[in-house]
């Protein structure tokens, strides 16, 4: 089997505002990095699935037709939750103007792909059955901004000839006090038995089959409702190497694998399930683990070499 990796120009986005609205969205070149770690996961590499089949709900229809696939060389810009903090969500028209400026500037730099951060903290920049609206939209998690930001992002990206991939942090629910308050619809409160704690945050339990299914179903929801060109995970997998993070789940599993191998298996199971969910809709699925294989394997239990 083949491992596909691509290089991309990594560019930061920042907004410079004055009274009366946004003056201009600048894209500052932070540097050119090789995305040796941008991997398209091949199911045969991962082997037979041990993940349960998709649940009966939701009932899904065919996905909207995405824009033409990007050229083989991916020249991508990351638009992260940090950029959304400087974007105007006060109305659809205001957000559309900001989004259009961002996409126009990205296209003018010769990029062809946008990784748009649409689910950073177990909350979403779109209406979802699985996750509340992001606190980034209104300042309050779970509060409807009155429009669909992701729909606007897809439209404005495609208008500039850009492909748009929905960038997701699969496990992270809260980190270093962000968001400051979780709403009642957060998975952390709806499913407390799915949650693991560190000193600085809350994370979905990678070992939970229910969590894996939930995340795969949320991928199907995205692919059903939006003409996105890809699903993109970054390098936030296991947040700690501490044995007590999931000692109870490990003991309950009865696994004969070492703790490290068991954790890697859990991440592989999620990758396999989400890959299958996206590819059922002919939507690309990619992962950008950190740049060293040892850091991936031993620090976050993501077996990028296997992928």
Model-found features: residue ranges?
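Aromatic-lined carbohydrate-recognition surfaces of secreted/lumenal glycan-active proteins
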Residues: 165-169, 232, 263-297
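An active-site-proximal structural segment forming one wall of the substrate-binding cleft
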Residues: 105, 109, 156, 203-235
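Ser/Thr-rich, Proline-interspersed low-complexity disordered segments
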Residues: 45-69
């Amino acid at each position: 089997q083949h491992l596909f990796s691509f290089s991309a120009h990594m560019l930061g986005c920042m907004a410079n505002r004055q009274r009366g609205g946004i003056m201009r969205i600048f894209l500052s070149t932070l540097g050119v990095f090789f995305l040796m770690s941008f991997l398209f996961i091949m199911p045969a590499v991962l082997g037979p699935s041990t993940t349960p089949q998709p649940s009966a709900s939701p009932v899904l229809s065919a996905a909207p037709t995405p824009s033409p696939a990007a050229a083989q060389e991916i020249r991508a810009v990351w638009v992260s939750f940090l950029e959304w903090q400087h974007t105007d969500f006060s109305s659809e028209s205001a957000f559309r103007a900001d989004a259009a400026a961002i996409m126009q500037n990205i296209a003018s730099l010769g990029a062809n792909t946008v990784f748009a951060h649409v689910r950073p903290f177990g909350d979403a920049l779109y209406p979802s059955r699985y996750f509340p609206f992001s606190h980034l939209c209104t300042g309050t998690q779970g509060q409807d901004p009155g429009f669909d930001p992701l729909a606007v992002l897809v439209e404005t990206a495609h208008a500039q000839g850009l492909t748009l991939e929905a960038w997701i942090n699969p496990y992270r629910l809260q980190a270093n006090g962000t968001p400051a308050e979780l709403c009642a619809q957060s998975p952390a409160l709806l499913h407390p038995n799915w949650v693991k704690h560190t000193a600085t945050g809350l994370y979905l339990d990678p070992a939970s089959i229910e969590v894996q299914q939930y995340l795969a179903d949320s991928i199907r929801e995205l692919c059903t409702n939006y003409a996105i060109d890809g699903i993109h995970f970054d390098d936030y997998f296991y947040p700690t190497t501490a044995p007590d993070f999931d000692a109870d789940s490990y003991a309950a599993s009865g696994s004969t694998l070492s703790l490290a191998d068991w954790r890697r298996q859990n991440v592989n199971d999620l990758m396999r399930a989400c890959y299958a969910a996206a590819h059922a809709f002919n939507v690309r699925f990619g992962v950008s683990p950190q740049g060293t294989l040892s850091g991936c394997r031993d620090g976050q239990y993501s077996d990028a070499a296997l992928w």
